[in-house]
């Protein structure tokens, strides 16, 4: 079941030529298109389904610096500023509010890791506070659990996934971006060894630069052009509750439940580090690369072989551009939610917060997260194909840092001074044989 999502209209006419084509209408692609157009570039955004239809509307809606890997902290910090700027520019509410993020733990070892992280973050201008049990009780007087400590970052925020990407798309369109939904990119044409056009199901767009922000579909698109991009797919579950008392105005994370206050008075609810790994021929191909990641996360993961496994074997990784592509057979990935996770999270939430005893699950949904082996995204040119750029593999972090990731991608595409140092996000690290392991601290 797909979660609620504000829908936008498409531009009917496909341009014959633009400066940049952006493939993918999630938060990253829309943000990149917005920043490219603001710099005066002509931009067409093509999306096989509808804007925000996949993970950008299925995530938790957290916009956080807290707990980010060192490599992502600069991007997360810039993203919060850009959320405000882009929301104001759009003139449409994306639901962004700076309401803080709070983590709680029952583990002394985990608390110690948070203290170490807070010290590193402080050096990078992110100010988080380690909380004592007494301070937690003061913040959450109705919570009946016993905690050894917490971590709070008041400058962090939240946004509404159902509203955010459509709002950003409205801002992008205001600056001249054309948006084409139900328009799958089938592949790239090249001239003289560099990108010269994008072939879509509705026609060809000539261009000298293409940014692929295709999320779970990015690896398959790259393989069609002989480009290696190790991406694993994890199906995750979230839900929304009926309205209830405001036990937090922002986001709260524990081992037993994670919540975000919604504008409708309910909560977005989920369990962290839980999901189902979708086994695929590509994942077996990259099994050695992903092995350290699997060992790190295996306690929260299930393994599944679905019909897509066999479909990929039959389909292969090559197709003709004059016939329907794999991207046209599944317009929107809509995995079923794991209701055992939903029920466990709700039971834990109510047990720890009795004042929420009357809330119920209003809706649950699944989504597919595109994960890299080190859980750091790829925002980078592809050296093997000049004119081709990637902004993908956000590993469940993309929504919150989306505005800054899009800005960085736009900077890289145009050769501008980058928003932050892009070295950590290089495509090269994915294919040069180095050992990749998760760097997210918690």
Task: Give short role names for the model-derived ranges.
Residues 2-18, 39, 130, 365, ...:
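C-terminal lid/capping helical subdomain adjacent to the catalytic/cofactor pocket in oxidative enzymes
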Residues 12-28, 44:
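Beta1/beta-strand and adjacent pyrophosphate-binding region of the FAD-binding site
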Residues 31, 188-316, 328-339, 344-355, ...:
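Flavin-dependent oxidoreductases
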Residues 37-57:
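Glycine-rich FAD pyrophosphate-binding loop
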Residues 61-139, 256-259, 266-279, 283-304:
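Dinucleotide-binding Rossmann-like beta1-alpha1 core, especially the glycine-rich loop
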Residues 74-77, 103-113, 151-170, 180, ...:
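Short beta-strand to alpha-helix junction loop
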Residues 134-138, 304-314, 319-397, 427-431:
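Flavin (FAD/FMN) cofactor-binding core of flavoprotein oxidoreductases
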Residues 151-209:
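Helical element adjacent to the flavin cofactor pocket in flavoenzyme catalytic cores
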